[in-house]
Swiss-Prot record:
Organism superkingdom: Bacteria
Protein name in the entry: Nodulation protein A
Organism: Mesorhizobium sp. (strain 7653R)
Record's signal peptide: none
Gene of this entry: nodA
Major subcellular location class: cytoplasm
Length: 196
């Protein structure tokens, strides 16, 4: 049975403390399934793990938050080219709604990205999510950019670790204001900041 979800667009400054607490609980449950380390950033009512989103799309139903995606406009560097993207992150769907098609409702992200006037949307996922994101690619919503690593600043200072990390993740690019053919070549993407 499909849940009747309602999507809302929320700018970060419009969220109230109660919103952050509810989102924090949602993320601890979603990311806690991967491991307690992944849920840790969301303790204490914090609704972000690294960089804070600029805008969020939040789906809710009678049981609370059903799904979430965060968006942050930023300049990244691919090879020698700096350019604006909308980074997508903090993606999650409540477990009872997985495989019911709610992820396809994420298509409402595209009009928001068009309003933000970005050439591309960019996001990363773990390799374990490959089959999930390949569905979006088959429908032309996004393309997987193979053989690319992503360098990011760490969200917190750790005296025993370097200030940046280089990750081997799946890179997804969605053409918004330009053709996918205009995505610059390069084997490293520099976020020049923390992961969303």
């Amino acid at each position: 049975m499909r849940s009747a979800v309602q999507w809302r667009l929320c700018w970060e400054n419009d969220l109230q403390l109660t919103d952050h607490v509810e989102l924090s609980d949602f993320f601890r449950k979603i990311y806690g399934r991967i491991g307690s380390f992944d849920a840790k950033p969301f303790e204490g009512g914090r609704s972000w793990a690294g960089a804070r989103p600029e805008v969020r799309l939040i789906a809710s139903d009678a049981q609370g938050i059903a799904a979430h995606v965060g968006i942050l406009r930023r300049f990244i560097k691919v090879g020698e080219v700096d350019f604006l993207v909308a980074e997508l992150g903090l993606y999650g769907v409540r477990p009872d709604l997985e495989k019911l098609g709610i992820s396809f409702s994420m298509r409402m992200v595209h009009p928001v990205l068009q309003q933000l006037a970005v050439p591309f949307a960019f996001g990363t996922v773990r390799h374990a999510m490959r089959s999930h994101v390949e569905r979006f690619c088959r429908e032309g919503i996004a393309a997987i950019v193979p053989g690319v690593k992503v360098r990011s600043s760490r969200a917190n200072v750790h005296h025993d670790l370097p200030s940046t990390r280089l990750e081997d993740v799946i890179v997804l690019v969605s053409p918004i204001g330009r053709s996918i053919d205009e995505w610059p070549p390069g084997d490293v993407i520099d976020r020049n900041g923390s992961e969303l």
